[in-house]
Amino acid sequence: MSSPHVLVVDDTHVDRHVVSMALMRHNVRVTAVESVMQALMFLDSEHDVDMIVSDYCMPDMTGYNLLMEVKKSPKLAHLPVVIASSDNIPERIRKCLDGGAKDYILKPVKIVDVPRIMKYI
């Protein structure tokens, strides 16, 4: 079986790197992009993604916007999406979970969060 492939979406380089490195330590292939638009373009051309881990707060479009685009697409709706954010706002968390996110993890994402993320692959 090949390694799972996770798309990491975050506008902050450090956060993208931390999440990517944590996942790669668990033999996960990672593609990291810095915007929702880049993520959507990648998903349109790439079909072997097993999961998306996305920041919530990004310029132009949020992680919630990405979640909605994924869930309304027949070819992507099956993908698990985990939202990561430094904002512990109950209404936002509920909105993401009600919208179909598998989980909402508070940043900074830590090594101990990886098994929590991996269980959705």
Swiss-Prot record:
Family to which this protein belongs: Belongs to the ARR family. Type-A subfamily.
PTM sites of type 4-aspartylphosphate: D55
Induction: Not induced by cytokinin.
Response regulatory domain sequence ranges: 5-121
Disulfide-bond pairs as recorded: none
GO terms classed as biological process: cytokinin-activated signaling pathway; phosphorelay signal transduction system; response to cytokinin
UniProt cross-references to PANTHER family, sorted A to Z: TWO-COMPONENT RESPONSE REGULATOR, TWO-COMPONENT RESPONSE REGULATOR ORR8
SMART domains reported in the protein's UniProt record: REC
Keyword field: Cytokinin signaling pathway, Phosphoprotein, Transcription, Transcription regulation, Two-component regulatory system
Entry-linked CDD domains: REC_typeA_ARR
One family name in Pfam for this protein: Response_reg
Organism the protein comes from: Oryza sativa subsp. indica
Lineage top rank: taxon: Eukaryota
InterPro entries: ARR-like (IPR045279), CheY-like_superfamily (IPR011006), Sig_transdc_resp-reg_receiver (IPR001789)
Function comment: Functions as a response regulator involved in His-to-Asp phosphorelay signal transduction system. Phosphorylation of the Asp residue in the receiver domain activates the ability of the protein to promote the transcription of target genes. Type-A response regulators seem to act as negative regulators of the cytokinin signaling.
PTM annotation: Two-component system major event consists of a His-to-Asp phosphorelay between a sensor histidine kinase (HK) and a response regulator (RR). In plants, the His-to-Asp phosphorelay involves an additional intermediate named Histidine-containing phosphotransfer protein (HPt). This multistep phosphorelay consists of a His-Asp-His-Asp sequential transfer of a phosphate group between first a His and an Asp of the HK protein, followed by the transfer to a conserved His of the HPt protein and finally the transfer to an Asp in the receiver domain of the RR protein.
Tissue expression notes: Expressed in mature leaves, and at low levels in roots, shoots and flowers.
Protein name: Two-component response regulator ORR8
PROSITE patterns linked: RESPONSE_REGULATORY
